[in-house]
């Protein structure tokens, strides 16, 4: 539920519609009294107390729904920002795209997690701002939200101003990271000091000899 909501919200080019009670996963539908249900009032209600009960899990979905809307609503005219697809791997069931400075990453695989998954992304620093795996949302806390990720230089993609962003993607999780663009001149200096994976491997081979 969390992943589908986020992928829907993050790809909108207009408003985001949610039905009352659906923000926390209300278990019942709404059905007003009519001839077809014998004029019953049984489902003509919303159990608003469910989201406030600590012994149930509705609170987690409600908290996530509120958090993801808050992130997107902080971006002015978010719906007008272009969607830049960075990764779409059907085999791994991984999807990643950028909207302005927000990077959305999804691992829809039901049981396969990826450690150090490489995504070609604009050069810079990325920091976590939301994770569906956060314990506050009923997750396991497998993603370290304090870690800031720096892209890794690759000469093959230097002309496109893209580098490798390595992330841990637990199964069935979604995360949002904020992209911090390099300061003017910072990219050039960083590129000089960084070594590609290939050059590092070659150096290691020469040392062994």
Identify the function of each model-found stretch:
Residues 2, 7, 11-18, 22-209:
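Carbohydrate-interacting/catalytic domains
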């Amino acid at each position: 539920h969390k992943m589908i909501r986020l992928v829907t919200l993050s790809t909108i080019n207009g408003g985001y519609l949610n039905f009352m009670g659906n923000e926390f996963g209300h278990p019942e539908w709404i059905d007003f009294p009519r001839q077809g249900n014998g004029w019953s009032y049984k489902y003509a209600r919303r159990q608003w107390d469910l989201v406030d009960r600590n012994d149930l899990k509705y609170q987690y979905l409600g908290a996530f729904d509120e958090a993801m809307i808050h992130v997107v609503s902080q971006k002015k005219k978010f719906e007008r920002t272009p969607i830049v697809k960075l990764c779409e791997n059907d085999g791994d069931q991984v999807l990643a795209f950028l909207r302005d400075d927000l990077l959305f990453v999804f691992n829809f695989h039901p049981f396969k997690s990826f450690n150090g998954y490489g995504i070609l992304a604009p050069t810079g620093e990325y920091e976590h701002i939301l994770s569906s795996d956060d314990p506050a949302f009923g997750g396991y806390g497998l993603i370290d939200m304090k870690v800031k990720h720096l892209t890794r230089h690759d000469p093959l993609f230097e002309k496109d101003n893209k580098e490798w962003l390595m992330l841990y993607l637990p199964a069935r999780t979604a995360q949002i990271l904020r992209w911090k663009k390099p300061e003017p001149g910072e990219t050039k200096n960083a590129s000089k000091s960084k070594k590609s994976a290939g050059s590092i491997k070659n150096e290691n081979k020469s040392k062994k000899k």
